[in-house]
Amino acid sequence: MNKLTTMMLAATTLCVMAACYAKKPEPRPEPELNTTGFVNITDVVPDVILEIRYFSTYNFVGSRIDGYLQPTALLTREAADSLRAVSDDLKEQGYRLKIYDAYRPQAGVDHFVRWGKDLGDTAMKCYFYPNECKDSLFIKDYIATHSGHSRGSTLDLTLFDMRTEKEADMGGTFDWFGLESHPDCGGNPTTGTYRQNDTITAEQFANRMILRRAMMRHGFKPYDCEWWHFTLRNEPYPDTYFGFPVREL
């Protein structure tokens, strides 16, 4: 081995050692764990009422849902700003907003899926799905492996009547699995025309329309199967499903 070859091998060895011991860059957080674009709803809409059902045991599963560490509600900044406009609109009509759920981590969705596959667990059937067989919940899309809530711009909510100091009567409870929860139950939600029926009253249908119109006026789109469910039309993360837990930011 000549002198030149020896020097080249030594230089190569030093370069390899330098690469091995060089400080590695800090890993960037996975997109689904990054909370940068999210806010506490109460920081943007301070007079909103929170009743986070999945932090409690009063929900269709009957236990606190995975990923809900605190009884708070999170949304993307864009969705929260639009919700503030909704709140201001409805306050002029005598209502406040009451939120049941907003951003939902993937762990919560996975919890629903596990529960749905356990056909023997029907503890809350009489409260939320008395007319449905549990083995049909996936077929009818009541439960799915992904949820729009995990994208951060979807929420479930109702009206709180400031005059009566009670929730407005919507003709059905949040998370009721059945046709009674559909916005078109009892009328045409596009025109707001009530249709006489034995399921919901004209007043209940009108209350649903008050919420629906206010949400749509300020950039949210409704969901055909749930009167309480709305998604920001121009959501900032349409293809990202986040996984960080629900807790104060």
State what each model feature region is.
Residues 230:
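Conserved metal-phosphate-binding beta-hairpin within the catalytic cores
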